[in-house]
Amino acid sequence: LNLPVPAEFCGRFDTVFEAGTLQHVFDLPQVFANLHALVQEGGRVIHGMAPSTNHVDHGFYMFSPTLFHDFYTANGWRIEAEYFFEFFPFWFRGRFHSTPWKIRRYTPGCLDALAYGGFGARQVALFVVATKVPGATADRIPQQSYFSRFHQAQQRKRGTVPIFSDPVAPVAAVEKMGTVPLFLLKLKEWKQRLKRLLPRRLP
């Protein structure tokens, strides 16, 4: 998977299910290019068990959900589902055992309060489904949506901002401009500051 897939496999599949392989392959851009090549238009890529928090040395990488959201959004795919789930491993303290998994829907920014040490001992993994729609690509480099939100917040402080429905919006959305009253921006800013003082909890 570090190399391009053979041409005879390109566009042959309506679904590619990736269940914990991504983290073991060094060249991630090539893997995403391969997924794009394998799936026919209208087909789906499913990431079924992408390791996130507390998977040290399991593979080359642990993934933030923003990777999948930002990559597929930037490349014009339609994201059907994004979830993150907490779990203890099946083999736990010498016993084959698993407590119920806590599964939550992911939206950009929902984990900001937990970004640094907020999950404790819990393991977290990801589930993502993306559809290859007409015009979708795999070669656009995404801007991390965290910094897109930060940049938009700075623009709001100046008074006039683009109104996007998504932190990583298509270029065409720039045409949809709007202004936000300054007092509403300040109110939102203070609400965010107060929220940081509250105990951390999952959405």
Feature locations, PLM:
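Flexible, glycine-/basic-rich loop-and-beta segments that form/coincide
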Residues: 89-168
